[in-house]
Amino acid sequence: RSLRIRSAEEADAKNICDLFARTHEQTDYLLAYPEENSYTVEQEAAFLKKLLESDRDVMLLSEVDGDLCGCASVCVVGAKYKIRHRAEFGISVDKSFWGLGIGTKLTQTAIDCAKTAGYRQLELDVVADNNRALRMYEHAGFQEFGRNPMGFQSKASGDQTLVYMRLEL
């Protein structure tokens, strides 16, 4: 099997929307439920166009043998001077591709992109029960800096604690 990681393009909009629906149905650890994705393909394409025009933000896609199986993003926390050195990191991988190291490779590529873009800190939050993700982030060098015991409210399990993590670049 062949893994390819590349930047998303406008033409990827439909496949990204489909991936979002799939991955958000497969786990309760992501921010939204599939039905909460209100982006149309056209809106996703416009969002991707804006990302492509940015010199600092990026959405990465992972493909195995040409099939889209994951995505990761690095986006500025805010444009104000005091916070523009910080970027947010998000990632999701189709469950049928878990355990193949794709998340690790996407994460490392995102870290490299964040460094190249001049960010000084990469941040994320992760559900405390998501042990696989926590291990991956810790292995990549992220460190916990706080917790929110009511960070997510899950339909299935009620309150979920969020772990806040950061990586100095």
Model-derived regions, located:
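Conserved G/P- and acidic residue-centered "switch" motifs that form tight phosphate/ATP-binding loops
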Residues: 12, 66, 101
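Conserved active-site alpha-helix within GNAT-family acetyltransferase domains
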Residues: 100, 104, 116, 129-146
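Terminal substrate-recognition subdomain of acyl/acetyltransferases
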Residues: 1, 159-169
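Acetyl-CoA-dependent GNAT
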Residues: 37-96, 107-109, 113, 168-169
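Helix-loop element at the rim of GNAT/NAT acetyltransferase active sites that forms part
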Residues: 18-35
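A short beta-loop-alpha structural element at the N-terminal edge
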Residues: 3-18
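Conserved GNAT acetyl-CoA-binding A-motif
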Residues: 107, 114-125
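Conserved catalytic-core motifs of GNAT/GCN5-like acyltransferases
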Residues: 123-126, 138, 143-160
